[in-house]
Design a protein with these regions (language model features):
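Conserved ABC ATPase signature
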Residues: 143-147, 151
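Helix N-cap at the start of a conserved alpha-helix in ABC-type nucleotide-binding domains
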Residues: 179-181
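A short, proline-enriched helix->beta-strand linker immediately N-terminal to the Walker B motif
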Residues: 162-166
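Short coil-to-helix segment of the ABC ATPase nucleotide-binding domain corresponding to the Q-loop/switch region
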Residues: 102-110
């Protein structure tokens, strides 16, 4: 059996008295695409942000590519490990979060130069390769204000990939886009999956979940309602909660 590259055990997250993530476990193997769907307020985005400690879990362990962080211990004493984990876990957000005062190229090379210590020349070479891959070579010198939403999100994907992560996390990457721009982003994500990138994706794009994922998770009320392969999840779900959810959205 393939070793899991992401291992999550007993993950909890509280916001004050509000128990948002309720002790979830998850293993994701190398090259696997796991899609998390579910009703709003179910904890999907918080769960994803806990994987790379953009949100600090209240308890539990998160392991990415052999590096484990224990949220039950002092996170301050694990800051170095958290920084290392974040470099392993690329993240693409709902809002593109590009620096408005930087060009496309500047946005992509900022992380490798300032965080990884790459030379500017090395970072530019890698960025040009990625811009070609996402179909935006001609936009390298444009500022974000001159790009469409779909183009900005493709730049954000290139920016994350330029850090050479071992896994990619996508937090509703198409929900801020006009409908006609969604496909240009999901097509890039599909090609990334075909190349064997390990991905955890929170999305409302059910066609992506159905056609690209290896497993689909229904997350509701801070926990897993169902985890199944997409064929089973969408055509013969095991849980009544899943059937109710699908009946509302299909």
């Amino acid at each position: 059996m393939t070793e899991a590259i992401i291992k999550i055990r007993g993950l909890h997250k509280y916001f004050g008295p509000l128990h948002v993530i309720k002790g979830v476990d998850l293993d994701v193997t190398s090259g696997e695409v796991v899609v998390v769907i579910g009703p709003s307020g179910g904890g999907k985005s918080t769960f994803l942000r806990c994987i790379n400690f953009m949100e600090e879990p209240s308890d539990g362990t998160v392991e990415v590519d052999g590096l484990e962080i224990n949220a039950g211990e002092s996170l301050r004493q694990q800051r170095k490990s958290i920084r290392e984990l974040r470099q392993k876990a690329g993240m693409v957000f709902q809002q593109f979060n590009l620096f408005p005062h930087m060009t496309t190229m500047g946005n992509i090379i900022e992380g490798p130069v300032t965080v990884k210590g790459w030379s500017k020349e090395r970072a530019i070479d890698k960025a040009e390769e990625l811009l070609s891959w996402v179909g935006l070579s001609e936009k390298r010198d444009e500022f974000p204000s001159r790009l469409s939403g779909g183009q900005q999100q493709r730049v954000a994907i290139a920016r994350a990939l330029c850090m050479e992560p071992t896994i990619m996390l996508f937090d509703e990457p198409t929900s801020a886009l006009d409908p006609e721009l969604i496909n240009e982003v999901t097509e890039v994500m599909e090609r990334l999956a075909e190349q064997g990138m390990t991905m955890v994706v929170v999305t409302h794009e059910l066609h992506f979940a159905r056609d690209v994922s290896d497993r689909v998770i229904l997350m509701a009320d801070g926990g897993w309602a169902e985890i199944s392969p997409p064929g089973e999840f969408f055509t013969n779900p095991k849980e009544e909660r899943t059937r109710q959810f699908l009946a509302h959205i299909l």
